[in-house]
Swiss-Prot record:
Keywords: Cytoplasm, DNA damage, DNA recombination, DNA repair, DNA-binding. The RuvA-RuvB-RuvC complex processes Holliday junction (HJ) DNA during genetic recombination and DNA repair, while the RuvA-RuvB complex plays an important role in the rescue of blocked DNA replication forks via replication fork reversal (RFR). RuvA specifically binds to HJ cruciform DNA, conferring on it an open structure. The RuvB hexamer acts as an ATP-dependent pump, pulling dsDNA into and through the RuvAB complex. HJ branch migration allows RuvC to scan DNA until it finds its consensus sequence, where it cleaves and resolves the cruciform DNA. This is Holliday junction branch migration complex subunit RuvA. One of its GO terms (biological process) is DNA recombination. It is found in: Cytoplasm. GO terms for molecular function: ATP binding; four-way junction DNA binding; four-way junction helicase activity. InterPro entries: DNA_helicase_Holl-junc_RuvA_I, Hlx-hairpin-Hlx_DNA-bd_motif, NA-bd_OB-fold, RuvA, RuvA_2-like, RuvA_C, RuvA_C_sf. Coiled coil: none annotated.
């Protein structure tokens, strides 16, 4: 089991990062908030979770052990796999997720694409007591987000639809964000759009 990876950041994409450690490039799927803390060419440490399937081995990277442990905890809920768990952490930061579960806030959980009312209720019932067993841990201080290699609009819309938001809804949210922040880079625009979409659901 690979518990963490430390090394130079070779590539930052919309949903993953490549970190070179001991001459090996590791591809780690990550949330927008985690990717926003990384800088290409700088050294980074990410805590990891590995999902092994018959035909694949996938690494997921997190800024701290709290997010990694919550990722694992989410998957103990029936019907929640790695992709949906990552979508939850993309929309709700660890603190917000803890609060939503503790307060049985079904509405907050249904902001996540792919989670309906029943799924959110099941998540609350199964995790409300367990979530307090995951230690709270602050992540490392963030650094300057990477500069987008392609137009911001194209990248952000692709990322949002990849998380499960409808294309039209993603475009409308991004238009609102860019109207208010025309100079926003990809990471900033993506996080703002996610926040807006979460409020509107």
């Amino acid at each position: 089991m690979i518990a963490s990876v430390r090394g130079e950041v070779l590539e930052i994409a919309l949903d993953h990062v490549v970190v070179e450690a001991a001459g090996v490039g590791y591809r780690l799927n990550a949330t927008p908030s985690t990717l926003a803390t990384l800088t290409r060419g700088a050294e980074a440490r990410l805590y990891t979770a590995m999902i092994v399937r018959e035909d694949s081995m996938t690494l997921y990277g997190f800024a701290d052990t709290e997010a990694r442990d919550l990722f694992g905890l989410l998957q103990t809920v029936s019907g929640v796999g790695p992709r949906l768990a990552m979508a939850v952490l993309a929309v709700l930061e660890p603190e917000a997720l803890r609060k939503a579960l503790a307060e049985s806030n079904v509405a907050a959980l249904t902001r996540v694409p792919g989670i309906g009312k029943r799924g959110a209720e099941r998540m609350v019932v199964e995790l409300r007591d367990k979530v307090n067993l995951v230690p709270v841990q602050a992540g490392p201080p963030g650094s300057t987000p990477a500069v987008a290699a392609t137009p911001v609009r194209e990248q952000v819309v692709e990322a949002l639809t990849g998380l499960g938001f409808p294309l039209k809804q993603a475009e409308q949210a991004l238009d609102t964000v860019l109207a208010e922040q025309p100079a926003a880079d990809t990471s900033t625009a993506l996080r703002a759009a996610l926040s807006l979409l979460g409020k509107n659901r």
